[in-house]
Design a protein with these regions (language model features):
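Conserved RNA-binding domains used in RNP assembly and mRNA/RNA metabolism
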Residues: 2-163
């Protein structure tokens, strides 16, 4: 394999994955689910549309996750920033950043069209997330992380983030 093929491989792979992901995302109608907290879903929708950031603590299958509730757009912008400091080949960084930019653009477009289509979010995004196991053990990170989870998996929540 030549150097040119090495550089092109990540672009081709990410291009295919991005196409598959974009197709799957546009097929998701984001309709309300029965086992979902409608208030939390509405609150996430409000954050996605307004860009508001607010502290929140979630209970997810025995795990407590706490951080700043952010819009899907802010989440993907954060992923792009994280990739800029990744310890990997520059072409791979650029491919990831472009993929995150395109995916984030799709979410932004969905949020903008939300007024007309009344779509409902199916994912929740946190910045500076910290996790606490049911045993009380904190999952240690050097700093909080970006976190994404399915709204249908959230058992409960409260406004405000843990210190």
């Amino acid at each position: 394999m030549t150097r040119g093929e090495d550089v092109e491989a990540p672009k081709v792979i990410f291009g295919r994955l991005l196409n598959d992901l974009c197709t799957a995302m546009t097929e998701d109608k984001g309709e309300p689910e029965e086992n979902l907290d409608g208030f939390l879903q509405y609150f996430v929708r409000l954050v996605n549309r307004s860009g508001l950031e607010i502290g929140i603590t979630l209970n997810v299958s025995g795990l407590t996750i706490s951080g700043q509730l952010i819009s899907s757009k802010s989440y993907f912008e954060g992923l792009i920033q994280e990739m800029s400091s990744a310890n990997t080949d520059n072409q791979v960084k650029l491919a990831f950043q472009e993929a995150f930019r395109k995916i984030g653009g799709i979410y932004s477009q969905m949020d903008d069209e939300d007024n007309e289509n009344q779509t409902f979010p199916t994912y929740i995004h946190l910045r500076n997330a910290k996790m606490l196991l049911a045993s009380g053990q904190i999952i240690r990170t050097k700093r909080g992380v970006l976190w994404r989870g399915r709204l249908s998996e959230v058992d409960g929540f409260c406004l405000g983030a843990m210190d």
